[in-house]
Curated annotation (Swiss-Prot):
Keyword Cell inner membrane in record: no
Gene: M
Major localization class: virion
Entry-linked CDD domains: HCoV-like_M (cd21568)
Function: Component of the viral envelope that plays a central role in virus morphogenesis and assembly via its interactions with other viral proteins.
InterPro entries the UniProt entry points to: M_CoV, M_HCoV-like
Any Pfam family: CoV_M
Membrane topology per record: Multi-pass membrane protein
GO MF annotation terms: structural constituent of virion
Segments in the Intravirion topological domain: 46-55, 106-228
Protein name: Membrane protein
Length: 230
């Protein structure tokens, strides 16, 4: 004789239970949403790198959280229509998550920087300053880049990179790495303001399927040569 099948419990919420849940957790949810909103609103590399990193962590967690929720919807679908939509959303979320990882790995191979896994952008600005390679994310595909020296402090596109530099340390070329290619920006203008300040403007001059040099001992010109095709 076969043992009787245990019925699967049906989980459902009444309107009163939902209202009770919101009343109990409303304050905590409000604080969490406010915190996320502030981080997303003010998380820029030109303002605070610490806040920007927190913003990237939040964005990075969005995809796995979305996949978990869509799978949960598939398991506890209300009807076949909801099940169909949940399956489609799950497949789309997984595909986009895989594409993100593939593109990030390709960009990491090109630059060797962990900023390649930035979920916000696939544009990484690379500048070689006296043998030290700085890599930072930028949102847009700019036609020009501006490097500024203010009393020894180096800024490029408003992002602070380091200290102890002068105008003579600025390289002849700056690069922006993308998933499929590398853009080279040539220094077209340099102006000195006072003894320890000034700025330089770099103009996009070449695009190719290259990677950054594996060594950091070269100058800015060496970086611009873009050896080691991939």
């Amino acid at each position: 004789m076969s043992s009787p099948t245990t019925p699967v419990p049906v989980i459902s919420w009444t309107a009163d239970e939902a209202i009770k849940f919101l009343k109990e957790w409303n304050f905590s949810l409000g604080i969490i949403v406010l915190f996320i909103t502030i981080i997303l609103q003010f998380g820029y590399t030109s303002r605070s790198m610490f806040v920007y990193v927190i913003k990237m962590v939040i964005l990075w967690l969005m995809w796995p959280l979305t996949i978990i929720l869509t799978i949960f919807n598939c398991v506890y679908a209300l009807n076949n229509v909801y099940l169909g939509f949940s399956i489609v959303f799950t497949i789309v979320a997984i595909i986009m998550w895989v594409v993100y990882f593939v593109n990030s790995i390709r960009l990491f191979i090109r630059t060797g920087s962990w900023w390649s896994f930035n979920p916000e952008t696939n544009n990484l600005m690379c500048i070689d300053m006296k043998g030290r390679m700085y890599v930072r994310p930028i949102i847009e595909d700019y036609h020009t880049l501006t490097a500024t020296i203010i009393r020894g402090h180096l800024y490029i596109q408003g992002i602070k990179l380091g200290t102890g530099y002068s105008l003579s340390d600025l390289p002849a070329y700056v690069t922006v790495a993308k998933v499929t290619h590398l853009c080279t920006y040539k220094r077209g203008f340099l102006d000195r303001i006072g003894d320890t300040s000034g700025f330089a403007v770099y103009v996009k001059s070449k695009v190719g399927n290259y990677r950054l040099p594996s060594t950091h001992k070269g100058s800015g010109m060496d970086t611009a040569l873009l050896r080691n095709n991939i």
